[in-house]
Amino acid sequence: MESKPFSLPSQSATVLIGTQFGDEGKGKLVDYLSDQYDIVVRYQGGANAGHTICFDGKSVVLHLIPSGIFNEKCVCVIGNGVVIDPVALLEEIATVEALGYEVKGRLFISHNAHLIMPYHKRLDSLSESAQGDQKIGTTGRGIGPSYEDKFARKGIRVVDLLNAEVLQEKLRENLAQKNRLFTTIYDGEEIDVESMVREYEEFDKIIDPYITNTQLYLNRQLREGRTVLLEGAQGSLLDVDHGTYPFVTSSNPTSGGACTGSGIAPNHIGKVIGVCKAYMTRVGNGAFPTELFDETGEELGRVGHEFGATTGRKRRCGWIDLVAMRYAVAVNGITELALTKLDVLDGFEEIQVCNSYTLDGKEIFDFPTDHETLSRVKPVLTPMKGWMASNADARNFEEMRPAAKQFVEFLENELEVPVTFISVGPGRNETVFR
């Protein structure tokens, strides 16, 4: 029998991830790059992460639908690693359609993705309130409790919406347990089972056209030569395994999560693009070695409009931390960097960069992987001259201010990764490619 020739993986998939604590500006980059890809995939997280896209004088925040939806040639996929709030999803679909963009036929939802239910949101809020000083700083969107049910093998998946009997049985089983928690542990009220069954049976009629086996779909598309961009939510330092545990999210924003959350094998990944701000921010609690508590930190927040796209919470601001970023580069296998919000630094006479820490009086260069140690480090800051002018008109690297170029080159040399994309303003075209 004649043997078939081996076909090598295309390596036509790219992973785009945040290298910091989230809010790095991934939405702008995905929106820009979606012209170059056939499919954009969201692979983890839920409606706890907001991606802001600016175009045609509009500013739009998406939480679940991939940012590529505003490129009419692009197909968008919500992968199996995402936890989906059906109410939030339908609101987003309506928002996108109201802007004149077709969604049906361009958005596919994994049948294996888990659902966020009303009881998950209530548990999230009650559990966070009970933590007192040890609060994680969750968004209260039910993300953590939904992932808890997923890994406890009690979760309700998108595919369950298609079978009324299975849905009813799972809802009743889950609510029996959750109502006991509400009444005995939290001294609250029960959720009515029958009203929730009726509500979620209605979702089937609306969401059914979008549901598909996205693992099979994506692998078929790759075999046929399509290109795929995998879009992460949050940032590497919030990864449940590799982040500042326990002050982390409940999923894996790192590059490994792109494979498990989409069903695309690692040998299809050709590039891993790491997105980083020219400074750093963090929402919620947890160690933040370069955090600024003075007027400089306030100024970064004011100029950078640092308020959460999902919660509206004020973000904590600090200088860029290359110790943390070296760790993110290693954990993710980052092949190139995208630098965002460089324009926020336009008005600073001096900029600081953290290249090492001190711990108990000793200089260290490696990122501590336990939160207790990380909370005790002090940043060693290197001052750099600011450029005190806008780079918004620059469209290539040579047109940028000399001090701004020196800043970019310093980051490249220290991280040993090329910076190929520089955002010099909020607008879609205020971008420098190298």
From Swiss-Prot:
Active site: 23, 51
GO function term, MF aspect, one: adenylosuccinate synthase activity
InterPro entries found in the cross-reference section: Adenylosuccin_syn_GTP-bd, Adenylosuccin_syn_Lys_AS, Adenylosuccinate_synth_dom1, Adenylosuccinate_synth_dom2, Adenylosuccinate_synth_dom3, Adenylosuccinate_synthetase, P-loop_NTPase
Chain positions recorded as GTP binding sites: 22-28, 50-52, 315, 341-343, 423-425
E.C. number(s) listed in UniProt: 6.3.4.4
GO cellular component terms listed in the entry, alphabetical order: cytoplasm
Compartments where found: Cytoplasm
Cofactor: Mg(2+)
Residues bound to substrate: 309-315
Amino-acid positions noted as binding Mg(2+) in the UniProt annotation, renumbered to this chain: 23, 50
Biological process, per Gene Ontology: 'de novo' AMP biosynthetic process; IMP metabolic process
Alphabetic keyword roster: Cytoplasm, GTP-binding, Ligase, Magnesium, Metal-binding, Nucleotide-binding, Purine biosynthesis
Cofactor note: Binds 1 Mg(2+) ion per subunit.
PANTHER family per record: ADENYLOSUCCINATE SYNTHETASE (PTHR11846:SF0)
Complexes and interactors: Homodimer.
Main function: Plays an important role in the de novo pathway of purine nucleotide biosynthesis. Catalyzes the first committed step in the biosynthesis of AMP from IMP.
Protein name: Adenylosuccinate synthetase
Organism expressing this protein natively: Chlorobium phaeovibrioides (strain DSM 265 / 1930) (Prosthecochloris vibrioformis (strain DSM 265))
Organism placement in taxonomy: Bacteria, Pseudomonadati, Chlorobiota, Chlorobiia, Chlorobiales
Gene assigned in the entry: purA
